[in-house]
Amino acid sequence: MNTQQLAKLRYIVPEMRRVRHIHFVGIGGAGMGGIAEVLANEGYQISGSDLAPNPVTQQLTNLGATIYFNHRPENVRDASVVVVSSAISADNPEIVAAHEARIPVIRRAEMLAELMRFRHGIAIAGTHGKTTTTAMVSSIYAEAGLDPTFVNGGLVKAAGVHARLGHGRYLIAEADESDASFLHLQPMVAIVTNIEADHMDTYQGDFENLKQTFINFLHNLPFYGRAVMCVDDPVIRELLPRVGRQITTYGFSEDADVRVEDYQQIGPQGHFTLLRQDKEPLRVTLNAPGRHNALNAAAAVAVATEEGIEDDVILRALESFQGTGRRFDFLGEFPLNPVNGKSGTAMLVDDYGHHPTEVDATIKAARAGWPEKNLVMLFQPHRFTRTRDLYDDFANVLTQVDTLLMLEVYPAGESPIPGADSRSLCRTIRGRGKIDPILVSDPAKVAEMLAPVLTGNDLILVQGAGNIGKIARYLAEIKLKPQTSEDGQHD
């Protein structure tokens, strides 16, 4: 490393400077790629492997990283340390080779903890809302001129990246509870947005285990640190006496320290008042729809207020907030005449939400902002275990749309579970008597099956965490028009 690169490492433990080459297995994931991006910008030699290129790997290649689109033992040659995604199995040939060569193998969160060690860490945890809240906190701190480092699980649209190396002392990071690895983090401030049953295989199916893990995470705060917690969530309210740290609560609840009042949504914007203890009320215009995003903003404001950031800076950042990739992501509005011969248009929105609570929040935001629209959802269930465990919740939530098209379950490496498939879920929803779902067994036929159900005054929600985001972008690319054999088909 040259002198300029070493100067960037002022927030790194001195011994970490002995590390030269960091290899990431599963580098194409947003969380992994974000950490790799920060380390690349700090001057480390970065390599990594994944199965296929994507925007994350392209960005890292642009920064000088070496990316392999395979998993081979020789990929870890000369690495000082190997960082692994929780999605990677222990028998991966690169992990096996690293162990044989006595190269340290660590999880993503351990490397994130190293980045946070000598910085003022702000960690955002919770079942839902982490990515957007992380982006909001980052936006406010950037607007205040504090030049934070951030590592997010989704694309921060204003920056065009998942992660950025700043020169300030703040590190703002999404904290992942899916594999309990957030216990490696020792932040100064921790936000917990909500706690619901998800990733229960990590917690042996025991919700009490999940709750205790969140408490353990908060106990990583120093006694002078602060927990910022959504008191609207009944589980969080139950856990407050066990936190044992300074707490700021937020929510719509009357007893919240930072309280959301008078919420109104007009199109894609939320308008509301934030009441804070011993502070002037803030009248907020938030450039993100839905009551759930008002809560995310309240969490960000609670942290920023505690830091002493001026109100006018906070308001500017929230009004100009550009959102995150695949979170109520507006992809365009398209005329329907070329699609199905009808007059009028259809709006196309892409959203990552894949838990019933998240899907419900997206539907409510769509209904509140565009109440007159025909609401069409293209949904892809994510994981057979989640579909099984939350089956009735999915069936209840998905009946709220006007038209539902459902893709097959995205397995994410899981084996099928009888009765936890899309055909069964469609049958159950049909039995409720409200809507008649359409099963889309062939993703190449999405546009063909979508066109006939569009009326000319539609809002299409493309919803899910699997590969459905690619389908959303494809629909935008073809402007919803079904492709003939001459046009070519989406694979």
From Swiss-Prot:
Q: Which residues form the signal peptide?
A: none
Localization of this protein: Cytoplasm
Which Gene Ontology terms of cellular component type are present? cytoplasm
Task: Name one process (GO BP) from the record.
Answer: cell division
This protein's major location comes to: cytoplasm
Q: List the disulfide bonds.
A: none
Q: Which residues make up the binding site for ATP? A: G126, T127, H128, G129, K130, T131, T132
Which reactions appear under catalytic activity for this entry?
UDP-N-acetyl-alpha-D-muramate + L-alanine + ATP = UDP-N-acetyl-alpha-D-muramoyl-L-alanine + ADP + phosphate + H(+)
- Residue ranges of coiled coil: none
* Residue ranges of the TM segments: none
Family designation: Belongs to the MurCDEF family.
Free-text function comment from the UniProt entry: Cell wall formation.
Record's protein name: UDP-N-acetylmuramate--L-alanine ligase
Q: Which species is this record about?
A: Escherichia fergusonii (strain ATCC 35469 / DSM 13698 / CCUG 18766 / IAM 14443 / JCM 21226 / LMG 7866 / NBRC 102419 / NCTC 12128 / CDC 0568-73)
Q: Identify the coding gene.
A: murC
